[in-house]
Amino acid sequence: LRQENREQFKDQVILIKGARKFRFEYIAGFLQKQSHATVLEVDFDAMVHNLNYFRSLLPRKTMIAVMVKAFSYGSGAGEVASLLQYQGVNYLMVAFADEGVELRAAGITIPIGVMNPEPEAFDHMIEFNLEPEIYSLELLEAFDRVLTKHGIEKYPVHLKLNTGMNRSGLDPEDLPALLKFFETKRKVIIRSMFSHLAGSDEARHDEYTLFQINRFIEMTKEVQARFDYPIIRHILNSAGIERFGQYAFDMVRLGIGLHGISAVGAPLWPVSSFKTYIAAVRQVKGDQTVGYGRKGVLGRDTRIAVIPVGYADGLDRHLSCGVGEVWIGGQRVPIVGNICMDACMVDITDTDAQVGDEVEIFGKHILVTELSDKLGTIPYEILTSVSLRVKRIYFKD
């Protein structure tokens, strides 16, 4: 391979297939352009397992929309979307039009909804057949005017109803004006009506969740009664599917559950593994310090490993000084001193670790939920914080 001109493979898709024991990732590494050895491994088998788990909770007729916004929660937009399209999901949902345009460029042909449409992007959305969420009458009127300009009719939109999240959406008192708008022939059709649950993952909010669901039922009945075509209804997110599956309606929206996070402790599989390697090892005397601000106080002679991952890669700086750990050689070792922009140091005194050994930041041994709990945040933030300079590697047996 080293005798080959790698430029001949530019912009080509190459299938490298075989058992993991053959370490074909070395061939992939030779061919790829991005060579930073800190990587995010994405296990497509785990993702399909998780998708099928949520499918098993739903009636067969229930459609599934999958959230692929924010680079598919950090896992890679086009790659994950292609897998989901192959797996037969009904809709993909992105946050902004640019994300949808990127998916179309990657060959995605199934319907794509845009959750945060901006009027400036309406023309792009129409060009690439992206379906906007409509959360206000003003936005609906603006989009209808753009459709009139293009001479387009029956363009699908998704009506967002505010049932208690109080972030965006049409309130019950907005419905008369909405229905009056449709008394005149319009260029849009309502493809779906949906709402967002504020606390479906926590039992302490169950009464409020049921209040939201009942309000959603009332609002959608009022709207549907004025139209002679069926409008899709959806309110359940990942936690809602697990805890309130009887309200699946016509479609559900799967997000964090696809990535292995369950609201009920279900045996989902971790999808992403954030990994690097030991770049250097040094012996440091116990009376010395390590890192910026001399915050790495040792107290004993210590073997320090330097690993090429820092806060610019997505390793949260609040994990500095022993708060966080990494997995090396079958055990946990603590982070020493302050995490740097591009590197951090860990204590490997009690291991046989050497230069070149693999390091797991999170994955099968240190779960994303463990990190989010330790940092007082949510798994979404951990996953979406992994920098784009970190290479994504996809596995499927």
Model segments located where?
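Flexible, charged surface loops at secondary-structure boundaries
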Residues: R6-K10, I126-E127, Q246-Y247
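Active-site anion/phosphate-binding pocket segments in diverse small-molecule metabolic enzymes
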Residues: E41-D43, V48-S56, M63-V66, E99, ...
